[in-house]
Design a protein with these regions (language model features):
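A short helix-loop-beta-strand connector motif used in the catalytic cores of GNAT acetyltransferases and
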Residues: 5-19
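Acyl-donor (CoA/ACP) binding surface of acyl/acetyltransferases
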Residues: 17-127
């Protein structure tokens, strides 16, 4: 997941990619990718965190801060979405805690390490 996130950051505005740190130690990252053209009212969010920090509420807080940042700095964005794997229950819970709702389940659309997975689409709308 970290590698795909890094690939996304290489194609993005560096101001939209933020480090997640604990005591000045990099433990993860979160980024927002505003879409263009007919999708310009949307932005995709991605994130990752080191496994030793899972379950501590850190990502939920980072997502909440990124949502506030995005809606505060991108007036045309009305929807932020994330696409966790269907079997990534922890990521689904984190998104739900941060106010995202499930919009879609796409069956067998992704492949990771040779395993075909469902893709979920979670989103939050501008209040």
């Amino acid at each position: 997941h970290g590698r795909s996130f890094i690939k996304m950051t290489e194609q993005n505005d560096p101001r939209n990619i933020l480090a997640i740190t604990v005591k000045n130690e990099l433990i993860g990252a979160i980024g927002i990718h505003p879409k263009t053209d007919i999708d310009r009212m949307n932005a995709e969010m991605g994130y990752w965190i080191a496994e030793t920090y899972w379950g501590k509420g850190i990502v939920t807080k980072a997502i909440e801060q990124m949502v506030a940042y995005t809606f505060g700095h991108f007036p045309d964005i009305t929807r932020i979405f994330a696409r966790p794997y269907g079997d990534n229950i922890a990521s689904q819970r984190v998104l739900e805690k941060a106010g995202f709702t499930l919009e879609a389940r796409l069956k067998a659309t992704l492949i990771k390490n040779g395993v075909i997975k469902d893709e979920l689409v979670y989103a939050v709308r501008r209040p």
